[in-house]
């Protein structure tokens, strides 16, 4: 997202954080799972209805008019906390109309992660999302079943419930179901990686994806994590992915930056040099 949209997302996130914060001695906390469902539903409507999306992101329309439209469209359907978040979002400026629906989808993920935080399971959910993404990478029939646009969401939900219920945290199951049902982005594996990144960010950590041809001992992982953290100047969370195709060495990806120390890269470089 560009500057204006980043500010809009930050403002809406602050409203989400305020809505889901629980002070000591406060009554029962807001249902973060309900907020997640509401925000996702609004995002999906914006994806289906470009006229509504344009009306809610029109910088020429007064903020009061945009928030009033939200109230007319969703006021009786959304929880009060969800409505406040959407009001904040449409009151912001967005670099592109699509960014509003992307922001609401991201906030729906964060709302589910609040549920995991309350359960003390945020790290567990982050790890399960990453590992299920790797399973999809190695299981083409399963990945195809979850990305099939003709398959109803209910069918995918039943499949995922059968696979994950009792084996993964309930928040993980809901997030994987959300990734599979996402018709806006489509790529389930990429969405799971993004969800894992959002979970890491909520824990104040940055994720590095480490691809290695052979399993690494816990001692090697610890040393590698310390070295990568020093290199990037911040605390880095490692997620190790076995990939025999790189032959040896490691490939480290942090966001859009890739440090390729694989044998495959050196082999390809040597081959190119010989062919010159």
UniProtKB/Swiss-Prot annotation:
Entry's Gene Ontology molecular function annotations: proton-transporting ATP synthase activity, rotational mechanism
Predominant localisation class: membrane
Subcellular location: Cell membrane
PROSITE patterns: ATPASE_DELTA (PS00389)
Keywords: ATP synthesis, Cell membrane, CF(1), Hydrogen ion transport, Ion transport, Membrane, Transport
InterPro entries: ATP_synth_OSCP/delta_N_sf, ATPase_OSCP/d_CS, ATPase_OSCP/dsu
Similarity comment: family membership: Belongs to the ATPase delta chain family.
Matches recorded under PANTHER family: ATP SYNTHASE DELTA CHAIN
Protein name: ATP synthase subunit delta
Species this protein is from: Frankia casuarinae (strain DSM 45818 / CECT 9043 / HFP020203 / CcI3)
Gene giving rise to this polypeptide: atpH
């Amino acid at each position: 997202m560009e500057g204006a949209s980043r500010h809009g997302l930050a403002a809406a996130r602050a409203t989400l954080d305020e809505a889901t914060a629980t002070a000591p001695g406060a009554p029962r906390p807001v249902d973060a799972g309900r907020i997640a469902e509401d925000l996702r539903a609004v995002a999906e409507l914006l994806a289906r209805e470009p006229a509504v999306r344009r009306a809610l992101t029109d910088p020429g329309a007064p903020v009061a008019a945009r928030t009033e439209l939200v109230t007319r469209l969703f006021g009786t359907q959304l929880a009060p906390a969800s409505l406040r978040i959407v009001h904040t979002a449409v009151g912001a400026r967005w670099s592109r109309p699509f960014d509003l629906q992307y922001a609401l989808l991201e906030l729906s993920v964060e709302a589910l992660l609040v549920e995991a935080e309350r359960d003390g399971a945020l790290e567990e959910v982050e790890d399960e999302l990453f590992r299920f993404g790797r399973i999809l990478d190695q299981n083409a029939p399963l990945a195809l079943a979850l990305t099939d646009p003709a398959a109803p969401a209910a069918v995918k939900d039943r499949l995922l419930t059968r696979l994950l219920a009792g084996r993964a945290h309930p928040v993980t199951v809901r997030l994987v179901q959300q990734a599979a049902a996402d018709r806006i982005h489509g790529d389930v594996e990429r969405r799971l990686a993004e969800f894992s990144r959002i979970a890491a960010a909520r824990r104040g950590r940055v994720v590095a994806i480490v691809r290695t041809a052979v399993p690494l001992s816990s001692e090697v992982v610890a040393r590698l994590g310390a070295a990568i953290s020093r290199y990037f100047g911040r605390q880095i969370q490692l997620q190790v992915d076995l990939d025999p195709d790189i032959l040896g060495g490691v490939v480290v990806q942090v966001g859009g930056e890739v440090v390729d120390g694989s044998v495959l890269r050196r082999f390809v470089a040597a081959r190119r040099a010989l062919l010159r």
